[in-house]
From Swiss-Prot:
Protein name per UniProt: BAG family molecular chaperone regulator 1
Any Gene Ontology biological process: response to nicotine
Chief subcellular location: nucleus
Pfam families, per database record: BAG, ubiquitin
Function (record text): Co-chaperone for HSP70 and HSC70 chaperone proteins. Acts as a nucleotide-exchange factor (NEF) promoting the release of ADP from the HSP70 and HSC70 proteins thereby triggering client/substrate protein release. Nucleotide release is mediated via its binding to the nucleotide-binding domain (NBD) of HSPA8/HSC70 where as the substrate release is mediated via its binding to the substrate-binding domain (SBD) of HSPA8/HSC70. Inhibits the pro-apoptotic function of PPP1R15A, and has anti-apoptotic activity. Markedly increases the anti-cell death function of BCL2 induced by various stimuli.
InterPro entries, sorted: BAG_chaperone_regulator, BAG_dom_sf, BAG_domain, Ubiquitin-like_dom, Ubiquitin-like_domsf
Naturally occurring in which organism (per UniProt): Rattus norvegicus
Biased composition (Basic and acidic residues): 1-14, 26-39, 85-94
Region called 7 X 6 AA tandem repeat of E-E-X(4), residue ranges: 114-212
Subcellular localization(s) per the UniProt record: Nucleus; Cytoplasm
Subunit description: Homodimer. Forms a heteromeric complex with HSP70/HSC70. Binds to the ATPase domain of HSP/HSC70 chaperones. Interacts with NR3C1. Interacts with the N-terminal region of MAPRE2. Interacts with PPP1R15A. Interacts with BCL2 in an ATP-dependent manner. Interacts with SIAH1, SIAH2, HSPA8 (via NBD), HSPA1A (via NBD) and HSPA1B (via NBD). Interacts with ESR1; the interaction is promoted in the absence of estradiol (17-beta-estradiol/E2).
CDD domains: Ubl_BAG1
Length: 358
């Protein structure tokens, strides 16, 4: 230390320093030349060159001559390509892991969303199914109620009846025992609404007179709202009484006609040989007596009809009486035919020498 920098003075006796003296020019030029020469060398050899130039091998730091070692910036060693690749691969691995985790998270979230959606859809489907079943049940119940109502309520038909200048809106319902309304039901309803008795009525539908009382209205082509025209006058008490008499006589004619039909059948059995020959004579005598009583009954009916005096204004009564007389005359003619056959069979038995009871 004494050789390099001389003797050190004690700190307490330090004298004020004077201005720093520069080194001689020759020495400065030498350092500059050294530095210039040293610039072309690598950093590992620069210190030795500098020492050789100064004439001794020592460190320049702290030299008494005041020469300082120039500071050299420490260069950052560039990363090698292998380290960069490793870092890049690590970053790629990290980014891939993040991407995978994100994908897994997204997949899990999507799966959860799909499960929730599936549950909601299943719930909605169940609700819709339940609602449809309830609707079907209600519809079936309503249909059953409608069917029961239709079965309980008989079919009806609305008809518009016109009489002179009057109009009647009627609702025809079938009577007990009929599945649908017939002409008889319509005529009775017209009688109640208009006051025209059924015998005096003439109902016309589409230009045709409704005469058959047992014909269903649907068979005539009648539908709801159809129009029916009524021709006839309201009842006359006197004529109504005459009509009642004629009706009673008509019932008697029907009964007598039924009796005549039975006699005609018995005669047919005898003619076909269904009865034994020994019994035929007695049966023929009995038939002869019955046919004569039947003829007498028809004659009495004709007499009662003839005794009825009907004014000319009783057109319906007069027409009914005329038709009844014709009917009785037809039955009388049939009685004459039966009586004639009885006589022929009796003569045939007599010709075969069969004794007839007295």
């Amino acid at each position: 230390m004494a050789d390099r920098g001389g003797a050190r003075r004690p700190r307490g006796d330090q004298e004020p320093l004077g201005p720093r003296l520069r080194a001689p020019r020759s020495a400065r030029e030498t350092r500059q030349s050294e530095s210039r020469a040293e610039r072309g060398l690598p950093p590992s050899q620069r210190s030795s060159v500098r020492s050789a130039a100064s004439g001794h091998d020592r460190s320049t730091r702290g030299a008494a001559s005041g020469a300082c070692k120039p500071r050299v910036k420490k260069k950052v060693r560039p990363r090698s390509s292998q380290s960069e690749k490793v870092a890049h691969s690590k970053e790629l691995t990290r980014s891939k892991k993040l991407t995978r985790s994100k994908k897994v998270t997204g997949t899990q979230e999507a799966t959860q969303v799909e499960e929730v959606t599936t549950i909601e859809e299943a719930t909605q489907t169940e609700e819709i199914t339940v609602a449809e079943e309830v609707t079907q049940t209600e519809n079936m119940a309503q249909t059953e109620e409608m069917v029961q109502t239709e079965e309980m309520e008989p079919p009806t038909l609305s008809v518009v009846v016109t009489h002179s200048n009057e109009r009647y809106d009627l609702l025809v319902t079938p009577q007990q025992g009929n599945s649908e309304p017939i002409v008889q039901d319509l005529a009775q309803l017209v009688e109640e609404a208009t006051g025209v008795p059924l015998p005096f009525q003439k109902l016309i539908f589409k230009g045709k007179s409704l005469k058959e009382m047992e014909t269903p209205l649907s068979a005539l082509g009648m539908q709801n709202g159809c129009r029916v025209m009524l021709i006839g006058e309201k009842s006359n008490p006197e004529e109504e009484a005459e009509l009642k008499k004629l009706k009673d006589l008509e019932v008697s004619v029907e009964k007598t006609a039924n009796h005549l039909e039975e006699l005609n059948k018995e005669l047919s059995d005898i003619q076909q040989g269904f009865l034994a020959k020994e019994l035929q004579a007695e049966a023929l005598c009995r038939l002869d007596r019955k046919i004569k009583a039947t003829i007498e009954q028809f004659m009495k009916i004709l007499e009662e009809i003839d005794t009825m005096v009907l004014p000319e204004n009783f057109k319906d009564s007069r027409l009914k009486r005329k038709n009844l007389v014709k009917k009785v005359q037809v039955f009388l003619a049939e009685c004459d035919t039966v009586e004639q056959y009885i006589c022929q069979e009796t003569e045939r038995l007599q010709s075969t020498n069969l004794a007839l009871p007295e």
